[in-house]
Every structure is written in structure tokens, then in C-alpha cells.
Amino acid sequence: MATTSTTTKLSVLCCSFISSPLVDSPPSLAFFSPIPRFLTVRIATSFRSSSRFPATKIRKSSLAAVMFPENSVLSDVCAFGVTSIVAFSCLGFWGEIGKRGIFDQKLIRKLVHINIGLVFMLCWPLFSSGIQGALFASLVPGLNIVRMLLLGLGVYHDEGTIKSMSRHGDRRELLKGPLYYVLSITSACIYYWKSSPIAIAVICNLCAGDGMADIVGRRFGTEKLPYNKNKSFAGSIGMATAGFLASVAYMYYFASFGYIEDSGGMILRFLVISIASALVESLPISTDIDDNLTISLTSALAGFLLF
């Protein structure tokens, strides 16, 4: 009887110890820290839209790039700093290339056109997924808008930047195409953000598509379009191909973080949007207005209709 009583008491003590919380346990760290409500909602939404990702995988991958999950404001401030350094380093690099005359000015301008927007979008996972993250991220191209205005108006002078972003080295050109380019990227960032494939379509067709259209068209564009002698079949095909491939690449990139769902249907929609953007870019009206505007608006409208 004594043995049975002792065993019973030990069992009760063990159960009590196991079920009771450890008061002195250290606070949780890293990605298991409390996160803002809007981050949790966004992650849950991403999970429900995709059956390919287990819940734990999406939660960890969605937060993997966020620097301080327990403090979204601090995390977004740091992300803004890192992205600004990356973006302006790219601009500085191409500006120096333009100043030294290493490449043809037209080629440098298009390389900047391709590079800046795509590099900026690579940094989006560093920001939180709500409107706060979108606003902090949009400050990066927003600062560039101010920079374009100051350069274009002649408030200050930067020969390298002007050469790398203008057709003929005239500072006033920055108030047209380059300014529309940055405005389009900023608008896509704020309005659509990283959970929308429309943002991918707009930026990829604007940057990769339009940039490659000019490069390919100048090199292989001997066969001109019948309705626009300033455009070529090679340039239009190059634009549609580059915009489409970049869109698919970023689809898989954002899907790896759980922001969107990669699928064959989405790939097909990206193809349609890239073809539509290339067709509009080839029209004479795109030259009269500005292809940075027409491509962005076409991609956004087609994306709105398809997604």
C-alpha cells in the first residue's frame, strides 16, 4: 500500500510539473516573436490562396526577410535604409559609367531603365506586408522623383546622372520620360504592392520589356512595322519576351515568400499582358505621349481585367 501511495503522489507531481508553465523561461526570439496584426492577416490570406505551401513554411518564409518582426516600424525603417543604399548605389554606378563614356549613352540609359526598377522590386520582401511597408518602400523612388525634379529644373547639376537618364544629355528631358518612369514604379508600389501580380506586370513590362525593346530593336530591327516605321518586329518581340520572362521570374520570387500563388494560369495571364503592352508600345501614340506612361497604364489595365 505504501508503495502504491508513493507512486500515485509521484505521478501527480510529474503531471503538475509538465502541465505548469515555466515562469523563468527566457523570452522567445527571432521569428517567433509577436508580430503586428496586419502582418498576420496578410500571411493568413496568402496561405488560404495557395495549397502548395504548408502553414509553417509560409509563416517562416513570409517573415524570413523582415529584419525585426517584433517591431514593424523599426524593420521598415531599416529596410528603407538598405533599399535606398542599393538603389542609389546602382544609380551612382551607371552615372559613373556614363560620365566616363565607357558605353554608348543610349545603351547606358536603357541599362539604367532595366536595372533600377527590377533591383528596387527585389528589395520588397525586406518590408512588412501591409500599407505601412508599401509607404516606406515607396519613399525610395519618391526621393528619386524629387531628385529628377531638382535636376530637370536645374536646381543642381549631376552630369553623370543626366547622361545616363536622358537621350541627348539635356537636363530638361528628366522632367518627361524618366520622371514618368519613377512615378509609374511609385504608383505600382503603393497601390498594388507585393501581394498583387499586377505590380509585377507593370514594373517588369516597364523596366525589362521597354528596355529590351530598344536594345534589341537597335541591333536587330531591320524589319520595320508597317504601321510605325520607328518600331521593328524584333524590338516588339524582344519587349514581349523580356517583360514576360521577368514577370514569371518575379512571380516565383514572390511566391517563395508566400505573397502570391504561382500557377500556370498566372503565367498565361502574364504572357497576355506582355503582348498587349508590346502592341501598345509599338503604336505611334506611345511615341507622341510617352511609352513609360502607355506601357504602365496598359499593363495595369490588362492586369485589372485578367487578375
UniProtKB/Swiss-Prot annotation:
Specify the transit peptide boundaries.
1-65
List the signal peptide residues.
none
User: Membrane topology per the record?
Assistant: Multi-pass membrane protein
- Does the record carry Protease as a key word? no
Catalytic function, reaction form: (2E,6E)-farnesol + CTP = (2E,6E)-farnesyl phosphate + CDP + H(+); (2E,6E)-farnesol + ATP = (2E,6E)-farnesyl phosphate + ADP + H(+); (2E)-geraniol + ATP = (2E)-geranyl phosphate + ADP + H(+); (2E,6E,10E)-geranylgeraniol + ATP = (2E,6E,10E)-geranylgeranyl phosphate + ADP + H(+)
Task: Please state what is observed when this gene is inactivated.
Answer: Increased sensitivity to abscisic acid.
Query: Mind telling me which residue stretches traverse the membrane in this protein?
Result: 77-97, 116-136, 137-157, 177-194, 197-217, 237-257, 265-285
On induction, the UniProt comment says: Down-regulated by abscisic acid.
EC number assigned by the record: 2.7.1.216
Q: Which GO molecular function annotation, any one, does this entry have?
A: CTP:farnesol kinase activity
Source superkingdom = Eukaryota
InterPro entries xrefs: Phytol/farnesol_kinase
Job description of the protein = Kinase involved in negative regulation of abscisic acid (ABA) signaling. Substrate preference is farnesol > geraniol > geranylgeraniol, but has no activity with farnesyl phosphate. Can use CTP > ATP > GTP = UTP as phosphoryl donor.
- Give the family this protein belongs to, as stated in its UniProt record: Belongs to the polyprenol kinase family.
Q: What is this protein called?
A: Farnesol kinase, chloroplastic
Origin organism of this chain?
Answer: Arabidopsis thaliana
